[in-house]
Curated annotation (Swiss-Prot):
Record SUPFAM superfamilies: Glyceraldehyde-3-phosphate dehydrogenase-like, C-terminal domain, NAD(P)-binding Rossmann-fold domains
Chief subcellular location: cytoplasm
Keywords: Amino-acid biosynthesis, Arginine biosynthesis, Cytoplasm, NADP, Oxidoreductase
Organism this protein belongs to: Methanoregula boonei (strain DSM 21154 / JCM 14090 / 6A8)
Biological processes, Gene Ontology terms: L-arginine biosynthetic process
Name the UniProt record assigns to this protein: N-acetyl-gamma-glutamyl-phosphate reductase
Record gene name: argC
EC code: 1.2.1.38
CDD domains for this protein: AGPR_1_C (cd23934), AGPR_1_N (cd17895)
GO molecular function per UniProt: N-acetyl-gamma-glutamyl-phosphate reductase activity; NAD binding; NADP+ binding
Family: Belongs to the NAGSA dehydrogenase family. Type 1 subfamily.
NCBIfam families (UniProt xref): argC
Reaction(s) catalysed (UniProt annotation): N-acetyl-L-glutamate 5-semialdehyde + phosphate + NADP(+) = N-acetyl-L-glutamyl 5-phosphate + NADPH + H(+)
Domain of life: Archaea
Length: 328
């Protein structure tokens, strides 16, 4: 099966190529970049030297030859491409935010007009597997909402307030240097940003609502001096008290059939480079604390995108993804 990665120069694009190298049925045959056409993929992603001889291309959407296309492009760019690919029978997984939210919500949160909106499955397979199976298009979730929603899902409907506090690695900001990600500003430091207004909060609220939760939801992210990973602490305030053993039983039962969700002490290093989400809970009266750990570039982006592709195309859900993390 031929795969195109549209916007392959960034971290997510590199991870897609790395992970798909191990897929039993998918072969990356096209990697695109508007500014790097003609340059070898391995020149931008040296970790792929010896694993791919592809060069970046800059084809028009109607010239892309593929069965599946991953859109690893900036927000607002996917809406100019997705429909054209779908009209040619190419299945699409969109890693941008363009189709994660209803049209009016997207336009309010991102401050732009959506020029080609259509509803799409929201690709957290553990929660929306049926919608993703055989789908022609899936909107891949944001990294923060993935870790947060998986942390809260089993107990969200019992809560009146949910507060997400996330620590994220610098790769989540992308590969364009900035003062925020400059080493002297990141090293030996922890800094909150967008304290009350991060755009991913809209996805979290959307997913909690789908889970039947009426809880008020709040979110604050922090940048920490690591390359990869998101550690999310969910403070879940319940309507009625639950003991830790009851909450633990509930979580174990909820995720018992989910290969990529493991009930164990969350550590960023244990999930680094993998598609796993590690979760553990503890409670005190009406307060439940849930901690989750994911790799923001894998379960938070490219790995989950491949997991969705597998569901869309009838492959084993773990194909290309069943490798452990990189501890230490």
């Amino acid at each position: 099966m031929k795969v195109a990665i549209v916007g392959a120069s960034g971290y997510a694009g590199g991870e897609l190529v790395r992970l798909l190298y191990h897929h039993s049925s998918a072969e990356v045959t096209c990697v695109t970049s508007r500014s790097l056409a003609g340059i070898p993929l391995s020149e931008v992603h040296p970790q792929l030297t010896g694993f791919s001889d592809l060069r970046f291309e800059n084809p028009a959407p109607d010239a892309i030859d593929a069965d599946v296309a991953f859109l690893a492009v900036p927000h607002t760019a996917a809406m100019t491409i997705a429909g054209k690919l779908l009209s040619r029978g190419i299945k699409v997984v969109d890693l941008s935010a363009d189709y994660r939210l209803p049209k009016d919500t997207f336009e309010k949160v991102y401050g732009v007009t959506h020029t080609d909106y259509f509803p799409a499955p929201y690709g957290i397979p553990e929660l929306h597997r049926k919608e993703c199976i055989n789908a022609k298009f899936v909107a891949n979730p944001g990294c923060f909402p993935t870790g947060a929603t998986l942390a809260a899902a089993p107990i969200a409907s019992r809560a009146h307030t949910i507060i997400f506090d996330s620590k994220t690695g610098v790769s989540g900001a992308g590969d364009n240097p900035s003062a925020t990600t400059h080493y002297p500003n990141v090293g030996d430091n922890v800094s909150p940003y967008k304290w009350t207004s991060h755009r991913h909060l809209a996805e979290m609220k959307q997913e909690l609502s789908k889970l039947g939760s009426k809880a008020a939801c709040y979110f604050t992210p922090h940048l920490v001096p690591v390359n990869r990973g998101i550690l999310t602490t969910a403070h879940i305030l319940l309507n009625e008290p639950l003991e830790t053993k009851e909450v633990e039983k509930l979580y174990r039962e909820y995720y018992k059939d989910e290969f990529f969700v493991r009930y164990q002490k969350p550590m960023l290093s244990a999930v680094r480079g993998s598609n796993f989400c590690d979760i553990m809970v503890e409670s005190e009266g009406k307060r439940v604390v849930v901690v989750s750990a994911i790799d923001n570039l894998v379960k938070g982006a490219s790995g989950q995108a491949i997991q969705n592709m597998n569901l869309m195309c009838g492959f084993k859900e773990t194909d290309g993804l069943d490798a452990p993390g990189l501890l230490p």
